[in-house]
Amino acid sequence: MTERSPLRVGIGGPVGSGKTALTLNLCRALRDKYNMAVVTNDIYTKEDSNFLTRNEAMSPDRIVGVETGGCPHTAIREDASINLAAIDDLCEKFDGLELIIIESGGDNLAATFSPELSDLTLYVIDVAGGEKIPRKGGPGITKSDLLIINKTDLAPMVGANLDVMDQDAKRMRGEKPFLFSNMKTQDGLEEIIQFIEKQGLFKA
């Protein structure tokens, strides 16, 4: 691959939607295929980066946790400097990085990534939040490059109708893609990887 800036994939979504589980699965699936690293955002701790390290997502020096303080959406949108600095450090440390995953801190449906921080945005919501989540809209649901409706296994327990969520997601997103997933069983993971590779021009 010719030298170029790494593809930066932002993963956003509310607390508990499955962002870190998705990040872990992506790391395990792609770490031997691409020169990659991860930046995680937490408000006052580095819990997500520690989780990825404990679960051996990849070499610990390729996982950077930043503490955003205050509102986590500020660090991915209004003032992305702390994340941009972490990315610069990783690019200096690892020559020829091809892929950097930026996991946001848990936030509301209005949070979006700054275009200067993320080339591709994945937004994760979960079925446990209720079948009304897609129709509530917000930039994450309507404008993300890929909407991921996670934890499909919980639908019977919370009384969520996946058909309704499917119809609402289509209505809210128009032609933009979305998919259902279960990161516990890696259901949907291959489709997410294919999307990243296709959009990131890793594959023809």
UniProtKB/Swiss-Prot annotation:
Q: How does it assemble?
A: Homodimer. UreD, UreF and UreG form a complex that acts as a GTP-hydrolysis-dependent molecular chaperone, activating the urease apoprotein by helping to assemble the nickel containing metallocenter of UreC. The UreE protein probably delivers the nickel.
In the UniProt record, which is one GO cellular component term?
cytoplasm
The source organism is Acinetobacter baumannii (strain ATCC 17978 / DSM 105126 / CIP 53.77 / LMG 1025 / NCDC KC755 / 5377)
Q: What Pfam family is a match for this entry?
A: cobW
Name listed for the protein in its UniProt record: Urease accessory protein UreG
One of its GO biological process terms is: urea catabolic process
Q: Which gene encodes it?
A: ureG
PANTHER family associated with the record: UREASE ACCESSORY PROTEIN G (PTHR31715:SF0)
User: Where on this chain does GTP bind?
Assistant: G13, P14, V15, G16, S17, G18, K19, T20
* Family annotation (HAMAP family): UreG (MF_01389)
Q: Which InterPro entries match?
A: CobW/HypB/UreG_nucleotide-bd, P-loop_NTPase, UreG
**Highest rank taxon of the organism:** Bacteria
Family according to the record:
Belongs to the SIMIBI class G3E GTPase family. UreG subfamily.
State whether keyword ATP-binding applies.
no
Q: Which UniProt keywords apply?
A: Chaperone, Cytoplasm, GTP-binding, Nickel insertion, Nucleotide-binding
The Swiss-Prot or TrEMBL record annotates one GO molecular function as:
GTPase activity
Locations listed in the record: Cytoplasm
